[in-house]
Each structure stands twice: as structure tokens, then as C-alpha cells.
């Protein structure tokens, strides 16, 4: 292959510049050449020139960039919009059924966690330490209900104790 690596790299940079800036390829090539193929410098130059109305007078005037993290575009407009925004405004000003439905549960709503626990279930008591957990003298729950505690469960408990 006789493709020059510099030409290939320059073509890739031009294509990336066109995608990033949205300009024509010939303008991207001119800006990159003027910036000695420094991508960020050329991109910065492109956006600074597009923000200045009379770019041939840009050496006489100092303009702050208008779209940086410190100064978003149309900053005064954004401040004005935020100043009009109130968190409680929507709830107080509108009494529509949709607002009421969004803020309160339906009339037939009965959350399971608000009801009292079933009487057959013993309250859970957290162990004071991991070593004293097996020393609590409470009957082990059986499954299925009514089944007798058999040797299989005792073997399982012994196997669990052996793993510790």
C-alpha cells in the first residue's frame, strides 16, 4: 500500500472535524491546517469564529465563549425560566382529578405492610451476635405446616454448622 500515513491521519481528522462541527470538509481542512493539525485548537477556533458576528474584527474585541460549562447558552433566559418555576405551584394552582390521583392512593388501596401481621407468625428477633444465633431456644418453623420436624432438617442444620 502506498497510502501516506500522514495523509490518512489528516483525512480522518477532517472527517471527525466535519462530524463534530457540522461544517464543510474544505473549511475543516483550512482550520486544521491553520491550527497545525491540532484538533482541539481548530475546533475552538471554529466555534469562536461562528459566535462572533463580524469575524474580520475579532482581533479588536474580546468575547467570552457563550457555550461553556460555566456559561450555558442563553444564560439570562435560563435564569428567568428557573425563577418562574415553583415546586409547589402545580399542586396549589390545579385541583384536577389527575393531580389528586398522582398525589394520593386510590380509595380501595390497602397496603399489606400497614395491616397487622398474621397471628401464627412469631416476631423476628435479631441475634445479638452471629455465634449466639443457634443458641436461641425457639421452635424451628416447619414446612409444610403440620409436618413433624424430622432427621433431614437436623442433618441440614448440622451441615450448616459444620461449614462455619
UniProtKB/Swiss-Prot annotation:
Q: Which CDD domains match?
A: UBA_F100B_like
Which Cys pairs does UniProt list as disulfide-bonded? none
Q: Where is the composition biased (Low complexity)?
A: 146-164
What's a Pfam family in this record?
Answer: UBA_8
Alphabetical keyword list: Acetylation
Chain intervals for the UniProt region annotation (Disordered) = 128-164
N-acetylserine-modified residues are 2
Q: Which InterPro entries match?
A: UBA-like_sf, UBA_8, UBALD1/2
Q: Which family does it belong to?
A: Belongs to the UBALD family.
- Please state what the protein is called: UBA-like domain-containing protein 2
Species whose genome carries this gene: Homo sapiens
Amino acid at each position: 500500500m502506498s497510502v501516506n500515513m500522514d495523509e490518512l491521519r489528516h483525512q480522518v481528522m477532517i472527517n471527525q472535524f466535519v462530524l463534530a462541527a457540522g461544517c464543510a470538509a474544505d473549511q475543516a481542512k483550512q482550520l486544521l491546517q491553520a491550527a497545525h493539525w491540532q484538533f482541539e485548537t481548530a475546533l475552538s477556533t471554529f466555534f469562536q469564529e461562528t459566535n462572533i458576528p463580524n469575524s474580520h474584527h475579532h482581533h479588536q474585541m474580546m468575547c467570552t465563549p457563550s457555550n461553556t460549562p460555566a456559561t450555558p447558552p442563553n444564560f439570562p433566559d435560563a435564569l428567568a425560566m428557573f425563577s418562574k418555576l415553583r415546586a409547589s405551584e402545580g399542586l396549589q394552582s390545579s385541583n384536577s382529578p389527575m393531580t389528586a390521583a398522582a398525589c394520593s392512593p386510590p380509595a380501595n388501596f390497602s397496603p399489606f405492610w400497614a395491616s397487622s401481621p398474621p397471628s401464627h407468625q412469631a416476631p423476628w428477633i435479631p441475634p445479638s451476635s452471629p455465634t449466639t444465633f443457634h443458641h436461641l431456644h425457639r421452635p424451628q418453623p416447619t414446612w409444610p405446616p403440620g409436618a413433624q420436624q424430622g432427621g433431614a432438617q437436623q442433618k441440614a442444620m448440622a451441615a450448616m454448622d459444620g461449614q462455619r
